Amino acid sequence: MAAVAKRTVTDWQLKPALGLAPLDQGRARQELAEIAAAAREEGLARLAKFLAGKGAGQDFLAAVFDLSPFLRDTSRRRPRILDALFDQPVEARLEAITAAIEQAPLAETVSESSLMMELRQCKAEAHFLIALADLAGEAETSLTVRRLSDLADACTRAAVDFLLRDAHGQGKLKLPDLDNPSLQSGWILLGMGKLGAHELNFSSDIDLVVFFDPDAPAVVDRLDATELFSRLTRRLVRILQDRTEHGYVFRTDLRLRPDPGSTPLAIPVEAALRYYEARGQNWERAAMIKARPVAGDLAAGAAFLRELQPYIWRKYMDYAAIADVHSIKRQIHAHKGHGEIAVKGHNVKLGRGGIREIEFFVQTQQLIAGGRFPELRGRETVPMLGQLAARGWITADARDALARQYWFLRRVEHAVQMVADEQTHTLPEDDEGLERIAHMLGFGDAAAFSQAFRASLLQVERHYAALFETAPELSAGIGNLVFTGDVDDPNTLQTLQGLGFQRPSDICRVIRGWHFGRYRVTQSAEARERLTELTPALLKAFGQTRRADEALIRFDEFLAGLPAGIQLFSLLQSNPALLKLMATIMGAAPRLAAIITRRPHVFDGLLDPALLTELPDRVYLSARLSAFLEGDRAYEEVLDRLRIFASEQKFLIGVRLLAGSIDPARAGRAFSDLADLTIEAALQAVTAEFAARHGTIAGGVVSLLGMGKLGSRELTAGSDVDLILLYDHDADAEDSDGDKPLAPSHYYTRMTQRLISAVSAPTAEGVLYELDLRLRPSGNKGPVATHIDAFKKYQRQEAWTWEHMALSRARAIGGDTGLCAEVEAEVAAVLGQPRDAAKVKTEAADMRAMIEKEKPARDLWDIKLIPGGLIDLEFIAQVAVITGQVGAGPRATGTAEILSRLAPGFADAGARQELGAAFALYLALTQMTRLCLTGSFERDDVPPGLSDLLLAVTDLPDFGVLEAHLKETSQKVRKDFDLLLRAGRP
């Protein structure tokens, strides 16, 4: 790069920060002298004197006029533009021009021809100044594109305001405010592409999409509205782009509107919304990312875009969008000259490593994830690179490199266009032309520029290719794989056996079924083509699960349930880590495989690159849930979204456990936090819906008490949820105050039944949780909702020892904060009551003996029921709590924490360590088996992949050692149980 020139003090307000070198020094000085002469002819003595002088400013202008014929000719015709910079700096002058543009349509004597002249003169001056400031280094490229976009906005708004006032004058519209013609006019003009993103280039056309609201206050005749607004739009294009003696304002393109070949220039909003919902394509979704109301009725434009949000930002991540958008890029590459990275003749916008690749890099990821993460919905390219990096979708290196190269390439693009104000993106093919561009950018010569330009393209291409352009050989080097026809290929059978498949002929038959399009997901030719490309990698991944046949059959069942589309294959093809995870699920985790087979949308969350690094704690889950429920929603929709959210998050918590990014204890807390949040949200929805029908009870409040594994925050993937619903109200409360009043007890009983239905009823979106309310006072014989006073009385006067043991895990999970605090205090008080410790231990030991007799363990792997298993540990912890044998500190409900805090007089340090280690082992095995299996653990039918997972989570070398360790641990626990609770009793 050329050295930064030393600033010199002149009366001229533009101080060049860059020293530019002309192509020909003598010619440059001659051109400067000619412009000085033009200034003298115009009577601009101070400008003529300045141009005849010497200094950095004059050197800069001489170079500019030599390098850019467009800027030179503009200066010759209109030297007053340069002269104005003696009185105002560039920014102030641009503001004055913008103000003049805004006032132009409001002048009393304005006509269409006078407006066209005014806009062209203002635009020409602003255009010149923006270019000059850019070349001088006075403005960063980001400011240059913003200035160009603001100029286009102002010109478009001025033309629109003139046309609206004109239509008002003819009685075609009735504008509410002539000083603000666009207000409530119903005419919507959306800027698309670079205009919408405030990223306009120097000689760009502007892309507009035009809609109108026939019900807007200004519309006089709804039936004439389409013709009226289309006519106004046609005139708008003429005002902006027709070439006159004063030039043009902006070339204007309306082809991004819905179905441009058969629709009017202005489309009613309802028709547009119907089109996008029923027929909109992914490229149109991509285009709408950058859409921005730029003129006309801005409020109506914003409202229209809000209506479009569900179309642009899908509820589920959309993988098909990648292939769709990328196919456009492939078509662009098919054009001559775009296949190789070159400098001369290279298309800076569309060529390899060009601007479009950076834009597509950002846009495709926005399409995929913007529905889930609102922060990824921005219009501007570089800020979105920052957001993608912040969310972990791209590396900081990719962000910095692509942002740096984006602005560099935009500077190159501007230089190419500033030469002659032509809408071109192609570098010159001749030596002098390339030298000119190099000098405009501050390089010493074309060679230095070419080196930097080529390095930029290669850097962009490297990041872009890493995201999109993986194209493995179909055989992937693993042997013959032929699945055409209806006869098995012998070499293919051999390849499959080598990969680990036990029934290669059956596998061939399954794969041939895919290629025949027997499933909805494989019915299109493109889908089958993608699956063909993916099959070798699939077979290799499934072969590595050590139960290849079962893994592939489960994957086949998964495919059978998918809707038509190619999303999955595109995703797996471009993401080997995800393919490996999918194979692990299919080979080692039948339960998870069944979940994604029934509910394929849960697979969407696996695309989030932050999945394995972000901890699913309560704050994380709460934020995700809030975003998922945002907006005003109907009751049933809220419940459905809760079911969708819970099923997906259970799956993703499980995947984290499977991948080893969280440990079993954290998984238990995450499953429990998820249940807390979603059940409380369901309670809020039920309460509001119930109150709308039945009103409220005076002073009525509700608290949910989590029991069992929910209370102790030890839920597994397949756990039911134990709850007690408690309520309170004013002492003198009568019937509820709604249209259908209910007495208090009946009111809360009905509300609880509604909650049970909301949470546990099977629906198209599945079940939120299976609820169990049997731990409430009097169990199934008691009412489903319990008044707080009745709860207190029961716990203090009637509850059995086992009920107080169960209460030791109780935790308020939702509802009114005041009542929750009261419930927590009451639970603590009940647990702290004096008890006969010997009697409690005896009753607990007898209870355990009865369970052992009536429900003996099936085998060693029945971890809950085996002697010395989970129940033994839980009973020890619960007895310690209700007999006051837990160390000082906040009340604990988790078994692990209670065992670690057993009082020294109850259990010595050795026993505490032994019991804690046993619980950690049991928790790890239980979490993993409940995650992977739907039924019980069958020792002789364990998927090898699950065996590997169990060894990984317990850090043991082989399955035999694991079983020996499990047996030894249970024997130690039973010994401790006998010592602590049986106290030597036989």
Swiss-Prot record:
Region (Adenylyl transferase), start-end ranges: 476-986
Keywords, ordered alphabetically: ATP-binding, Magnesium, Multifunctional enzyme, Nucleotide-binding, Nucleotidyltransferase, Transferase
GO cellular component: cytosol
Protein name as it appears in the record: Bifunctional glutamine synthetase adenylyltransferase/adenylyl-removing enzyme
Listed Pfam families: GlnD_UR_UTase, GlnE
UniProt key word ATP-binding: yes
UniProt xrefs under InterPro entries: GlnE, GlnE_rpt_dom, HTH_AraC, NT_sf, PII_UdlTrfase/GS_AdlTrfase
Region Adenylyl removase, residue ranges: 1-470
UniProt similarity note: Belongs to the GlnE family.
Cofactor(s) demanded: Mg(2+)
Single biological process term from Gene Ontology: regulation of glutamine family amino acid metabolic process
Gene name per UniProt: glnE
Gene3D superfamilies on file: 1.20.120.1510, Beta Polymerase, domain 2, Nucleotidyltransferases domain 2
UniProt KW RNA-binding keyword: no
EC code: 2.7.7.89, 2.7.7.42
Database matches in PANTHER family: BIFUNCTIONAL GLUTAMINE SYNTHETASE ADENYLYLTRANSFERASE_ADENYLYL-REMOVING ENZYME, GLUTAMINE SYNTHETASE ADENYLYLTRANSFERASE
Function according to Swiss-Prot or TrEMBL: Involved in the regulation of glutamine synthetase GlnA, a key enzyme in the process to assimilate ammonia. When cellular nitrogen levels are high, the C-terminal adenylyl transferase (AT) inactivates GlnA by covalent transfer of an adenylyl group from ATP to specific tyrosine residue of GlnA, thus reducing its activity. Conversely, when nitrogen levels are low, the N-terminal adenylyl removase (AR) activates GlnA by removing the adenylyl group by phosphorolysis, increasing its activity.
The species this protein was found in: Mesorhizobium japonicum (strain LMG 29417 / CECT 9101 / MAFF 303099)
Reaction catalysed by this enzyme: [glutamine synthetase]-O(4)-(5'-adenylyl)-L-tyrosine + phosphate = [glutamine synthetase]-L-tyrosine + ADP; [glutamine synthetase]-L-tyrosine + ATP = [glutamine synthetase]-O(4)-(5'-adenylyl)-L-tyrosine + diphosphate
MF GO annotations: [glutamate-ammonia-ligase] adenylyltransferase activity; [glutamine synthetase]-adenylyl-L-tyrosine phosphorylase activity; ATP binding; DNA-binding transcription factor activity; magnesium ion binding; sequence-specific DNA binding
